[in-house]
C-alpha cells in the first residue's frame, strides 16, 4: 500500500436541497447560456482527452465502469434522490455521456484516482489542471443554477465517482465514500454496482493507497 501524507478534508456536502423554489419553472436553456457553456464543454473534452492520454502513458488497464454509468444515465438511474427532490425539473433525468467521459471512467475504475490523489484536498496548488479547471467547488444546492449546470454535465458524474475514491482512500473519511456513490447511483459499493450489470471486478472497493493528514 502506498501512503501519501496529505490533509484530506471532506468536500462540501454532496446534496443540499433546502430553500427550493415552490413554483416549477420550464426546463429552458437560453441561447445566451448555450453560448457561454459551449467553450467550457469544448475545453472539458480537450482536457479529459489529456487525462486519458496520461492513463495510457502509465499503462493503466481500462475497465467497464464508464460503460455501466453511461447505461445507467440512459436508463434514468443516475442521481435518483436529487432528481426526486427536484421540483423544478431542472436536473436531467436521462443523459448520454460523451465517448471521452466513458473512456475516462473506464480508466478511473482501475486507477482509483491515484494519478490525481492530491486533487480534492485542501492543497489546491497541487491539483492537476484538469481538476483545477473543471471540478465544481461552489454551493451544492439545486436552487443554484451553476450547481444544476454542473450536475447536468459529464463532470457532475465524474466528480461523484472521484469523490468516492477520494473518500475511500482517506484515513478520516472512508465512511463518506458510500454517501458519494449513493448520491450518484443508490449503490453502496462499486462492486455491487458492476455486478448488477454482470461485471465481476475483484478489489474494486479496496483502496490502493491511503491519504494521511498533515498541516
From Swiss-Prot:
Keywords for this protein: Host nucleus
Compartment list: Host nucleus
UniProt key word Transmembrane: no
Statement: the UniProt record of this protein carries the keyword Phosphoprotein: no
A single cellular component GO annotation: host cell nucleus
Major location category of this protein: host cell
UniProt-listed InterPro entries: Protein_Ac34
Pfam families: DUF1247
Domain of life: Viruses
Assembly information from the UniProt record: Interacts with host proteins P40, P34 ands P20.
Function statement: Plays a role in the translocation of the P40 subunit of host Arp2/3 to the nucleus. The robust nuclear accumulation of Arp2/3 induces nuclear actin polymerization to assist in virus replication. Mechanistically, subverts the host CRM1-dependent nuclear export pathway leading to Arp2/3 acumulation in the host nucleus.
Protein name per its UniProtKB record: Protein Ac34
Organism: Autographa californica nuclear polyhedrosis virus
Amino acid at each position: 500500500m502506498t501512503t501519501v501524507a496529505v490533509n484530506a478534508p471532506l468536500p462540501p456536502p454532496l446534496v443540499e436541497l433546502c430553500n427550493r423554489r415552490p413554483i416549477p419553472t420550464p426546463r429552458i436553456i437560453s441561447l445566451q447560456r448555450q453560448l457561454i457553456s459551449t467553450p467550457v464543454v469544448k475545453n472539458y473534452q480537450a482536457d479529459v482527452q489529456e487525462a486519458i492520454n496520461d492513463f495510457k502513458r502509465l499503462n493503466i488497464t481500462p475497465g467497464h465502469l464508464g460503460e455501466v454509468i453511461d447505461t445507467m444515465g440512459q436508463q434514468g438511474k443516475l442521481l435518483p434522490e436529487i432528481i426526486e427532490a427536484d421540483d423544478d425539473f431542472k436536473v436531467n433525468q436521462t443523459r448520454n455521456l460523451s465517448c471521452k467521459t466513458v473512456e475516462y471512467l473506464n480508466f478511473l475504475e482501475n486507477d482509483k484516482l491515484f494519478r490525481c490523489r492530491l486533487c480534492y484536498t485542501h492543497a489546491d496548488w497541487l491539483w492537476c489542471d484538469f481538476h483545477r479547471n473543471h471540478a465544481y467547488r461552489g454551493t451544492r444546492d439545486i436552487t443554484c443554477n451553476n450547481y444544476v449546470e454542473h450536475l447536468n454535465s459529464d463532470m457532475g458524474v465524474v466528480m461523484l465517482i472521484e469523490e468516492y475514491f477520494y473518500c475511500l482512500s482517506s484515513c478520516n473519511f472512508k465512511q463518506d465514500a458510500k454517501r458519494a456513490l449513493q448520491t450518484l447511483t443508490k449503490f453502496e459499493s462499486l462492486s455491487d454496482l458492476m455486478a448488477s450489470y454482470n461485471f465481476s471486478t475483484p478489489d474494486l472497493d479496496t483502496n490502493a493507497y491511503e491519504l494521511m493528514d498533515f498541516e
